[in-house]
Amino acid sequence: MQYNPTAPGQIRESLISSINSLFACKKTSFNSPDTAFSRTRKISLVQTVLFVMTAGSGTVNNELVDFYGENSLPTASAMIQRRNQLKPEAFRELFLHFTQKAQILKKFRGYQLIGADGSRVNLPYNPSDAFSHINCIQGRKGINQVHLNTFYDLLNDIFLDAELQGIREMDEKGAFCRLLGRQKDSGRKQIFIADRGYASYNIFGHAIHNKQLFLIRVPAAFAESMYKGPKHWLEKETEDESITVHIGRRRTKKNAQLQNYHCLSKSRHYDFIEPGSDNTDALQFRVLKFPIGEDSYEYIVTNLPKYAFPLQTIKELYNLRWNHEVAYRYLKYAGNMVHIHSLKRDFLFQEIYAKLTLYNFSSFVASAVGDIKKKTKKYTYVL
């Protein structure tokens, strides 16, 4: 089922349907598959999930009053017991199940535009949690954070996929590769757009081997190091060069004969060639340079074809990446992700995936309401 953009009520029904679909995967969703949510009680599965999604910055007791009203109010301990019956994977499954129903209405020349970015989420102080606690400055109180990596539809305002990492094990590039892998069988024409924190031959290799298109901003030093040839490489103010980079792990005579050969050390990730292997890989892409101010330039690496995506189009596509930054701001503040309640790690994961689902639900409804206004030309004005 995909959403009818003219029926906001159906979006809520579809969310409820996605929540109830967790009963079909009890083993991966419930901590006690045979007994969890098997009896009719004051707090149902739907109410448990919706409470976690919509909880704001108040105490659990205050949030329960807002959610249920003062009549037939359950206790905070009863809600916690219900949440304990759910695995954090249940909320991830809900997020993906609900999101996958969405129609991709807006495209760029037939392509779905997907931004990749990460953001830190502040958590309640808990020095005993090694997963999220870190001491940033010696002698001062530490903080608790997790790193949220997401793929985001830049034109349709939807978070498509996400991966959470502890602050000590943060690896944005590794998360990008895993998220890429989960999109390769989507059946859609897609372009992945990311900032210079994702400049990596491993990422380029994953996209190229998956036959996926990408556009990634890179630091000047990275761009200039990509071609081991004449010094005039990227010397002009505006450049659009097509190059092949040969990747390997050993400095052999055979490899040295390859044009533009790059030998990667053991410490550098490249998932397609094991350290010590004689194998090589060839990656083909474009490197672009253009001015953005006086003595200031942007560098882009992409495998988009030049005939269909000239320089001006590349600039236009990259500028759309800022929609992802805006979405994170709304997710954290309007979506209350800055008000995580729990110290328990499983509950943290529940709340973060619940807020991602709430963001997408709100985006679907806003899009549907906007579509209705366009078609009816009836607008409500607040005076």
PLM feature spans:
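Short edge-strand/loop segments of extracellular domains
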Residues: E70-S72
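Short Lys/Arg-enriched helix C-cap and helix-to-coil transition segments
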Residues: A90-L105
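Single, function-defining residue in the core of a domain
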Residues: M1-G58, D66-F67, M79-L86, E93, ...
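Conserved beta-strand elements of the Class I
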Residues: Q112-I114
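Short acidic (Asp/Glu) patches
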Residues: L96-Q100, S128-I137
